Amino acid sequence: MAVKNTSCMLCVWDCGIKATVEDGKLVKTEGMPEHPVSMGYICPRGETLPHYVYSDSRLLHPYRRKKGGGLERVTWDQALDICAENLTKVRDKYGSKALAIFCGSVGVENIEVAAFAQRFKSAFNTPNLLSVENICYRMRILARQLTFGRYTGEDYKDAECIILWGHNPDGSRRMLGDLIREKVNDHKMELIVIDPKRTELAKLGLHIPIRPGTDAALGLAMMNVIINEDRVDREFVDNYTKGYPELVEHIQQFTPEWASPITGIPVTEIKTIARIFAQSDASCIIQGINTLDQHQNG
């Protein structure tokens, strides 16, 4: 029996795991305490990796559908020939742009497949490469690139105030949830949870049960408060941003009084969370994947 250090590849967090191998077979997975990010945590998906690897439903060989129904196993050479023949027919009849490629995730957990898909796309001369990002977090990446110049991450370890905006770390990012609990219990952090659901973490801080789909209105009203009460870090704004005067003018219409009936949040609470967020020396917002990305007002 041997224990190997590796990582879980079932989602983008890439948590560290210790894999127990017996007679050449994976028999158990558990968290890796010394891992700098996951710190010993793995979710139920990571814990059940052996079942995933040895599932009776896992495809280990290529199959093709028979004319009368059902599937028949073919060799890899046969499968590649069938794919090449059909792809050539499509290109000859409709052009190369008729092909769309879906490669699953393009994150770190699937980077090899994503890299190959990019090369195959170029070789076939089609621009159509799709991934789960289209129904996941691509909009967030684009928004941060347009706003900050690159895709940035949250510096939550040093934060004095965290807003969990539509995010419940206990679901699949427990190490973050545990860190927040520790800092809140030690009175080292202010916690605000903006979520229609009262999660376990929401019970530790200020819970704002927003009406679903009205997040943009709340964000605009918070900016209105921060700007008009002069709670802005002017040195940062002057040195690292563009368009602030235009933002000041634009934001005047989005008052807490305007946002309150839209969001279902009292005016006093909108002002309170804006002030808490602005007065902390180190604040960050951690948004949930999909909860905001897939809505026009997210």
Regions found by a protein language model. Name each.
Residues 145-150, 237-246:
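Active-site-adjacent structural elements in folded domains
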Residues 108, 210, 235, 239, ...:
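A general boundary/transition motif marking the beginning of the first structured unit of a protein
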